């Protein structure tokens, strides 16, 4: 199966060349930044070209405004008045793409602590994480889930040049069944609270798709199965019915949006693929039949492998709720770094 990243390039704007080493010197290229000079020339020891698999010695990169005009060797003709940046022995790399992020979340948070986080606070967390993500080498990301459309606001702030960060494709609130992984299940019934993306039934999910598109979603995210951090559900069980998935995905595609689904359950993965989902997120219990279906439907897997290592390292210091501690070992066994 092809890697997810190759196809998701069509979901995102083409990334600018990210000069990794230049960040240490305080040189940051950000999306849609208004240029103050006509041209910039960057020199370094090497440049990696992933298209050809070659490493170019003594590269010269010519940047005009926000666009890379040319990449060549020392004999590349450059404007006489261009700003010169010589990075010495550094190696230049293209910007990376992360297709599963939650920039407005605090990685160490969860459980009842999340109830105290306001939407403005989440947006500010997103501004912090967006900058760190760019400095880590990622020039484009797909953000698949944020309350209150905080990710939409963050995307727009980055595009306007008000916040430093990568280009973003965002989903807004993820869709899910009442009481499911994408709902908010921590408050007692007298509060009558449900997450923004909660929707049940064919007509309701179609309406919810239209709503999140109305408020700025570039991509649609829904939860096809239970998860780890959600209270009262089972990651091995399907949540949306096949009919609901079909309606949700069909309506999303009709409105020109790709669809990603959180799916651990073997059955949920297969039903989502048959319904035409574009990507499976996580896919913990994906089996051989599911893999074959994904190949037949040209569906991509986003395995999100890194959290396996992150949780193994940080779980002892986190105040994980009891239901997370019960679920985690079956979904996140101690990972092998081989």
Regions found by a protein language model. Give the residues of each.
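N-terminal secretory signal peptides that target proteins for export/translocation
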Residues: 1-11
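Bacterial N-terminal signal peptides
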Residues: 14-26
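Metal-associated gating/positioning segment near the N- to mid-region
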Residues: 90-162, 178-181, 185-188, 243, ...
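Active-site mouth loops of central-metabolism enzymes
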Residues: 112-124, 188-207, 258
């Amino acid at each position: 199966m092809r890697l997810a990243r190759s196809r998701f390039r069509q979901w995102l704007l083409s990334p600018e060349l990210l000069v990794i080493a230049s960040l240490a010197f305080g040189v940051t290229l950000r999306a849609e930044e208004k240029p103050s000079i006509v041209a910039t020339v960057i020199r370094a020891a090497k440049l990696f070209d992933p298209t050809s698999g070659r490493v170019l010695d003594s590269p010269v990169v010519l940047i005009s405004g926000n666009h890379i005009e040319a990449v060549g060797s020392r004999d590349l003709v450059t404007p006489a008045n261009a700003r010169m940046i010589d990075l010495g022995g550094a190696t230049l790399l293209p910007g990376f793409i992360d297709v599963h992020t939650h920039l407005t979340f605090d990685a160490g948070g969860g459980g009842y602590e999340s109830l105290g986080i306001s939407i403005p606070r989440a947006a500010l967390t997103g501004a912090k994480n967006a900058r760190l993500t760019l400095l880590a080498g990622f020039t484009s990301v797909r953000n698949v889930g944020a309350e209150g459309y905080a990710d939409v606001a963050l995307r727009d702030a980055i595009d306007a040049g008000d916040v430093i960060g990568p280009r973003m494709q965002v989903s807004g609130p993820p869709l899910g069944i009442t009481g499911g992984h994408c709902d908010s299940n921590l408050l007692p019934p007298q509060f009558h609270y449900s997450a923004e993306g909660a929707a049940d039934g064919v007509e309701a999910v179609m309406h919810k798709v239209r709503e999140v598109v109305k408020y700025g979603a570039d991509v649609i995210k829904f939860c096809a199965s239970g998860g780890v951090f959600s209270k009262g559900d089972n990651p091995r069980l399907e949540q949306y019915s096949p009919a609901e998935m079909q309606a949700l995905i069909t309506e999303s595609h009709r409105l020109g949006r790709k669809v990603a689904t959180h799916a651990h359950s073997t059955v949920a993965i297969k039903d989502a693929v048959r319904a035409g989902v574009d990507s499976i997120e996580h896919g913990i219990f994906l089996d051989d039949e599911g893999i074959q279906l994904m190949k037949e439907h040209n569906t991509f897997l986003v395995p999100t492998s890194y959290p396996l290592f992150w949780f193994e390292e940080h779980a002892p210091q986190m105040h994980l709720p009891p239901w997370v501690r019960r679920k985690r070992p079956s979904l996140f066994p101690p990972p092998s770094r081989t």
